[in-house]
Amino acid sequence: MKDVKITVVRKTEHKDLSAIYENPIEHTCDLCVGDEYVSTGAQKPSGFCDSAWDCVKSFVQELANGGGNFFDGWMKNPHSAMISCNDGFRPVSFYIESID
């Protein structure tokens, strides 16, 4: 089974949508662009967001098992994926790639 690296490549905040629809919250996502995590054995890396893991885990598991080429050639690197978390107010984009 391969290790899989998860890199935070973009973090966005839709303040206009938050102002209209979201109740105020004290703690928001603390991931930062450039943060890297390594999944070993297709398991959630320590310190990685639980909600984001729910979004990326199927891709991580597939890459860890040697798969890839998602959606018939979607990515330039067939052993990678670009996946975002499902927070509509503060989406975070992750580049996921198998590593040797």
Protein language model regions, located:
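Short loop/turn segments at secondary-structure transitions that flank enzyme active sites
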Residues: 12-14, 43-45
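Short, flexible N-terminal segments of the mature chain
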Residues: 19-44
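Beta-strand elements of well-folded, non-transmembrane domains
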Residues: 10-12, 100
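Ser/Thr- (and often Asn-) enriched beta-sheet segments in non-cytosolic proteins
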Residues: 3-7, 36-38, 93-98
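Short, structured beta-strand/loop micro-motifs enriched in basic residues and often containing a Trp
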Residues: 2, 13-23
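Short, compact, well-ordered microdomains
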Residues: 58-100
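Short, Lys/Arg- and Gly-enriched loop/turn segments at beta-strand edges
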Residues: 44-55
